[in-house]
Amino acid sequence: MSAARESHPHGVKRSASPDDDLGSSNWEAADLGNEERKQKFLRLMGAGKKEHTGRLVIGDHKSTSHFRTGEEDKKINEELESQYQQSMDSKLSGRYRRHCGLGFSEVEDHDGEGDVAGDDDEDDSPDAESPDDSDSDSESEKEESAEELHAAEHPDDTEDPKSKKDAKSNYKMMFVKSSGS
């Protein structure tokens, strides 16, 4: 070690080319055995150059190697469009917006009057509906629309608006907590 210091005194610049006597810093010239071990060493040091083996080509895979026919494309497009329409219909109808939280009720306008969502006379319990009741919801909506059509065709058969308002206020009062107790 002292010999190395004597050959390179402090403060003297060394040449840019490495010296032959300091071969320990030149790891590319190190004898690692066969070529496989040398490649492994270079790869582990991060200096190995990866060679393209030709095995992997982008887009060439067994699952994607077949091409779709025009009929398959049409079928897939129709399925996607039907799914899109179903989701848009459910979003725009607001059917799933009704159950936004505990005690939440959304105001709907059927005949120009503000009705509270879920004010059917047959549903007297304040319990929230379960998601399994979606079929009965659509049936009750169909019945309501049929009743509205019948009322539009026969205006003389409908109830007077005053009794209808009284029935609504009585129904709403069933859920109002009394302040006397």
Swiss-Prot record:
Positions of the UniProt region annotated as Disordered: 1-181
Modified residues (Phosphoserine): S15, S17, S63, S87, S125, S145
Modified residues (N6-acetyllysine): K172, K177
Domain of life assignment: Eukaryota
Compositionally biased spans, kind Basic and acidic residues: 48-78, 147-169
InterPro entries: SMAP (IPR026714), SMAP_dom (IPR028124)
Acidic residues bias (residue ranges): 106-146
Cross-link (Glycyl lysine isopeptide (Lys-Gly) (interchain with G-Cter in SUMO2)): K13, K62, K75
Ranges that cross the membrane: none
Keywords, sorted A to Z: Acetylation, Isopeptide bond, Phosphoprotein, Ubl conjugation
Family of this protein: Belongs to the SMAP family.
Protein name per Swiss-Prot or TrEMBL: Small acidic protein
Gene encoding the protein: Smap
